[in-house]
Amino acid sequence: MTCDIKLTYIDDKLDPLLVDYLYTISENEHIFEYDEYNFDSSKDSYQSLLENTNIASSDIIIVDSKLFENEFADSKSKFTGQELKIIYAIANPFIKIIVITQNNDLSKYGVIKKFATSRECSGREQEEANKYYDNVLRKEIETLIKNVKEVRNVGQLLSENILSYEDSLIVEKANNLISKIPSYKDLTDEKINELIDLVKKDIEENND
């Protein structure tokens, strides 16, 4: 059985317990198609993620808060999952973003804490991780799946009533976004940098 909801997990170091949790749900329950992307700070940036067709075809993205480990990485690669969430809110607000973290102090930003893993993953630890993610992540995923389906239903209504909106560029753009037809003409580097600066400033102020 296949599913038309696609969930992609993005991390600079994919968490094996989370990977197993998401993959098992995908294989056993078929509520989403699972994919993953290993972020490489030596070559990746927010622009490369936006332009990656596999990621752009996702309905839900789970992304790590800190997408870089190398302190000498290109500055364009140094951005957080929170920043990516804001960027996607402009690039395509119909792609839903869940931000996860190993830190304890980001819940105020709607960030979900990862299960604390040890150096070696055991069967027992996987069971504990599954229970943890069932409590903190599962409901969020199910809610977003419901939202995606609702948006698609509205998009279908727009398509059926196309004659009523034939002169509306807004409706055309909405349909294109729902259909994952990208358009980044209005998403300039200047606008993106302004958004990133705002997020960074807010995080720094709250960490003081």
Mark where each language-model region is.
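A general structural motif
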Residues: 2-4, 56-58, 94
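Conserved acidic segment of CheY-like receiver
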Residues: 3-26
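A short acidic (Asp/Glu
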Residues: 16-21, 46, 71-77, 107-113
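Short, surface-exposed basic-aromatic patches at helix termini and helix-loop junctions that form
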Residues: 22-29, 51-55, 85-93, 111-117
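Short hydrophobic/Thr-rich beta-strand motif most characteristic of the beta2 strand and flanking loop
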Residues: 31-44
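Conserved phosphotransfer microenvironments
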Residues: 43-91, 102
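Alpha4 helix (beta4-alpha4-beta5 surface) of REC/receiver domains from two-component response regulators
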Residues: 92-152
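C-terminal output/effector regions of signal-responsive regulators
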Residues: 142-208
